[in-house]
Amino acid sequence: MQAITLLGSTGSIGTQTLDLVAQYPERFQVVGLTSYSNVALLAEQVRRFRPQMVAIGREELLPELRSLLTGIRPLPELVAGTEGLCQVAAHPAAQRVVTGIVGCAGLLPTLAAIRAGKDIALANKETLVAGGPVVLPLVREYGVNLIPVDSEHSAIFQCLQGVPAGSLRRILLTASGGAFRDWPAEKLDQVTLADALKHPNWVMGRKITIDSATLMNKGLEVIEAHWLFGLDYDHIDILIHPQSIVHSLIELADTSVLAQLGWPDMHLPILYGLSWPERLATPWDPLDLVKLGSLTFKAPDHRKYPCMELAYAAGRRGGTLPAVLNAANEAAVALFLQERIRFLDIPRLLERVCERHQVIADPSLEDILQADAWARRETAQLAQQAPAQVLA
C-alpha cells in the first residue's frame, strides 16, 4: 500500500489520479488533498477518500469547506493558503506526492515535498520550467525520485529504463499540433476562444488546451526535458504527430530510436507515476496498430508557432528568463480565456515581456519568485495599453 498526497485534486490530473486510486484500492491510499478554490468537489473527494489533511488555496474559503464537511468523522486537519499547501505536501504519512497544481503555484509545495523526502510524481511542468535551477539541486541533495507524469516525459523516462548512462543522444518530443494544426498561419488572426478550446485528441484543462494550440505547451516541455534528462537544447526536437499515439522518442548513440506508444489517455502515465518502478495490469483496451494503419510525423511550422521559438530562446538564455516566460504565458492565457486579448496577442505579449526583463543568470528561489511576480504585472500592464502600440 502506497500512501500518496495529491496536490491539485480537483483539476484534470487530480480527478484522473483519484479515478486510479479508486480502481486500485489495495495499492494506493490518499493521505492528503489540496485544491485552490473548488470547495464543493474537494468536499466530495474528502468524503470519498478520507484523507488525513486537506488544504484549500484560497484562505477565505476555509469556513465554507469546514461547513461542507460537517458530520465527517474523523474530520481531517484543515489548512489553507500557500503555507497549508506546503503542509499537505510535506505530510509525514505520505510516501509519494502527485503534483497536479497548474502553473507556477506548484513550485513552493513541490519544494516542501522534496525537503520532506517525498518521491515526486511530477505533473506540473512549470515547477521545472521556472524553478529548475533550484529544484534539481534539491532533488539530488535529498535523494528523492522525480517521476515525470506528463505523457511525453513519462514516455522518455520509460524509454530510458535500462539504457546505459551517456547513451542518450537526442530527445524527440511529439505534439498533436493542437486545435490549429490544419489551419493556415494566415487564418490565425480569426481564432475565437471556442476554436482554441477544441483539442483534436486529448481531454485537458482549459489553460493547457490553449498552450497546446499555441504550442507553448511543447516549448515548456522542451525546457522541462532539459532539466529532467540533462540534454542541451540543440538535442531536444519537436515532431508534429497528429495521431498522438507515439508519446515521445529517444535516439541513442548508435542511432537506435526507442519510442513509447499508447492511446492518448492520461490515465496511463499517471498510473506509471503512481506505481513506478512497478507496472500494474490494467483492464484497458490494448493498442491496435493494425486498426490504426499508419502513423505520421512532420516538422512544426515555425510561422504558426512563435511561442515554441520563444521557449527555446528562453531555455537557452536560462537564469530567470524561463520563469518570466512561463509567468507571462500564464497571465496572457488567462486574459485570452477572459476574451480580453486575441489569440495572436499571446506570443506578442510574451515577446515584449521577455525583451524587457533583466535576466539573473544564477537565480535563487527568491529571484525566481520575484521574476515571476514582475512578469505577471508587466503582462497585465502591457495588455492594458493600446494594441497598436504594444501588440501590433
Swiss-Prot record:
Reaction(s) catalysed by this chain's protein: 2-C-methyl-D-erythritol 4-phosphate + NADP(+) = 1-deoxy-D-xylulose 5-phosphate + NADPH + H(+)
**PANTHER family tied to this protein:** 1-DEOXY-D-XYLULOSE 5-PHOSPHATE REDUCTOISOMERASE, 1-DEOXY-D-XYLULOSE 5-PHOSPHATE REDUCTOISOMERASE, CHLOROPLASTIC
Q: Where does Mn(2+) bind?
A: 150, 152, 221
Please name the source species.
Synechococcus sp. (strain JA-2-3B'a(2-13)) (Cyanobacteria bacterium Yellowstone B-Prime)
Q: Which family does it belong to?
A: Belongs to the DXR family.
- Protein name stated in the entry: 1-deoxy-D-xylulose 5-phosphate reductoisomerase
Superkingdom is: Bacteria
Lineage, please?
A: Bacteria, Bacillati, Cyanobacteriota, Cyanophyceae, Synechococcales
Give the GO biological process terms.
isopentenyl diphosphate biosynthetic process, methylerythritol 4-phosphate pathway involved in terpenoid biosynthetic process
* Positions that bind NADPH: 10-13, 38, 124, 126, 205
Ranges that cross the membrane: none
Q: Which pathway does the record list?
A: Isoprenoid biosynthesis; isopentenyl diphosphate biosynthesis via DXP pathway; isopentenyl diphosphate from 1-deoxy-D-xylulose 5-phosphate: step 1/6
